[in-house]
Amino acid sequence: MSPTAATKVLIIGYVWPEPRSSAAGGHMMQILQSFLDQGWELTFSSPANEGEHKEDLTALGIRECPIELNNASFDRFVAELAPDIVLFDQFMMEEQFGWRVEQHCPNALRVLETSDLQCLRHARHQRLKDVLKEGTEEDDFSPLFAQAPEQEFQHMSVTDLAKREIAAIYRCDLSLMISEVEIELLVQQFHLPPALLHWCPLMLEQLPQGFAPFEQRAHLLSIGNFRHAPNWDAVLWMKNRVWPLIRQQLPGAQLHLYGAYTPPKAAALHNPAQGFHIMNWAEDALQVMSAARICLAPLRFGAGIKGKLLDAMLCGTPSVTTPVGSESMSQDGLPWP
């Protein structure tokens, strides 16, 4: 590469970015913009079909190139492109394409964007399933939320998913981590070298200048992509347990639930008589968040950090969540406000 040539970056996405559908999509766009700010030349590829709310990357000057799984055409594509950096979006993309990149572009820097530790999220999901199988009627999940790092490691380390994800991190030169809690878990429990991990949280370009006053707001709000398992579990928990308790205290309360790709099973929960409103996709998440009095995020499992809670902060909207929801969202051991 000549001294004047622009750095070429290939991003291999698990899906095409949809910043208005998920926090992960928004974070990817933030990363892409940071690359563009460096004057780098970007190519975005994905084996996924384009979603309904896909961002137009070409409008930003990013080349879009669909690719296929298990197809030698990728070998020719990456060899001709000759990227200086390859960013894999989630470890599954590294598994599929990393060895091909190593073979045809051995000098390329390989970077993994984890979004969140999937092995942590899945281990927590399995623990929740185990608790629910016991048939308890209690809604106190404090023991589930109060897992020490050593306990988290015990649950994670025995899974094939953890072995695959950790292996992908080792194969890459650097991994972008959105959560400091997950960095500590990898370093202290899995004994990964800290030099392999780089903290890359959600990035904000501009802060709002003011908030709508409480008197101009109405209703409670919950928001999240219905395809994301932690969000769907939160919807069911709200419907069956949390919301009835709120309505006992506030009979006139109304809850508006927004999310991309509303499935029939979610639409079937719509019940205005109970104040439970399935509102489908919000074109402008900050607009609906700014109009709400409270943001509910009763997440019983998950990982990473939560874009919906950051949006609530930006809008001056109080949020109510669980320790899983607030994880890595506050510093210096401060309690969630």
Where are these regions (language model features)?
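Short N-terminal targeting/anchoring amphipathic segment
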Residues: V78-Q96, V111
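N-terminal subdomain of nucleotide-sugar transferases
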Residues: M1-K54
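Short acidic/histidine- and often glycine-rich active-site loop of Leloir-type glycosyltransferases
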Residues: R121, P323-P337
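Membrane-proximal helix-turn-helix segments that form the acceptor-binding/catalytic region
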Residues: G135-S175
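Conserved catalytic-core segment of nucleotide-activated headgroup transferases in glycan assembly
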Residues: H27, Y170, L174-M177, V181, ...
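Acidic donor-binding loop of glycosyltransferase active sites
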Residues: P83, D173, S290-G304, C315-T317
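Short acidic alpha-helix that forms the nucleotide-activated donor recognition element
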Residues: D75-L81, A167-Y170, E283-A292, L314
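Short hydrophobic beta-strand element within catalytic cores of glycosyltransferases
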Residues: K308-D311, P318-T322
